[in-house]
């Protein structure tokens, strides 16, 4: 989405980012989310404001000057779905040791989807639905 509206997205140098990562909103609020990707926003579009970042991803969440936002994590992944992805990708994307370590992280971390659902609700309630271009 960032690329579509004039930003820049590039493939990361190195391995994919897979696991549970901590993000920090511009107001200081922190949250954990599931990540599984190689690509990253390296320059946000002029029509977007950065609203969250992480130690590995400077532009983790963008809010646009129209009713939309984009994220560099997977708010749609449930814990069970993410575990299935990890197991299916064991030895392909991560070594067995990395997969087991990531599964252990998932057991310890609380990943809430509430903040994302709240943002979607705000976008749909504050703006007419036909003005919402996309929520990714």
Give the role of each language-model region.
Residues 1-25, 32:
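Cysteine-nucleophile active-site neighborhood
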Residues 10, 24-136:
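Amide-donor transfer/coupling interface in amidating biosynthetic enzymes
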